[in-house]
Amino acid sequence: MEKYTEIIFILDRSGSMAGLEMDTIGGYNATIEKQKAQQGQAVVSTILFNHYSKVICNRVDINEVKKMDENDYQVYGSTSLLDAVGGAIVHVEKVHKLLGKANCPEKTIFIITTDGYENSSKEFSYKKVKSLINKHDDYQFIFMGANIDAYQVANDIGISKDTTVNYCCDSQGQRLCFNSIDNAISDIRKNGKIKSNSWRAESDNYYNKNTKIRK
């Protein structure tokens, strides 16, 4: 089978995302369109989470991924971050086992965005999610966090600070968040890994500028 990349989006849709619906929808759709133009095959899964997870596409060829709209992305509820991430990893593990080594993706990328702290998971703990992530050198994880200490949360679940970003939870911050996500995916698809910090520069600069203003 021809080599391909699997991209799993795990996107927060809890109540605190209210007001940023169109920015999130637009950012996601723009990222998908940009990735369609990249060389190589890819499949996409997209999970929207609050206190439960909703799958809006499951291993769909990237060229066939439908645009997200307001019916898909409706914000409410609490934040079961651990259940969303842990559940997604376990599902992907099972799928890859069924596919067999010859049919598994060459690269597997998890994109996680959240604008709040974990507050309602029932099935997965920090320890359990960290154990899942630590055993997968073959998976790559990008963690984008707003209104939280993203580095601490990422560390608590085993994600490297090199692939973690604090971003501003406003319209511009959301746009730059998805620009950074697109840069990261493109780098991994092309080079097999993220080769420098340039992918995140816009998000970092905007966050640092606004943090200084608030202080």
PLM regions and their residue ranges:
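Acidic, low-complexity intrinsically disordered regions
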Residues: 1-215
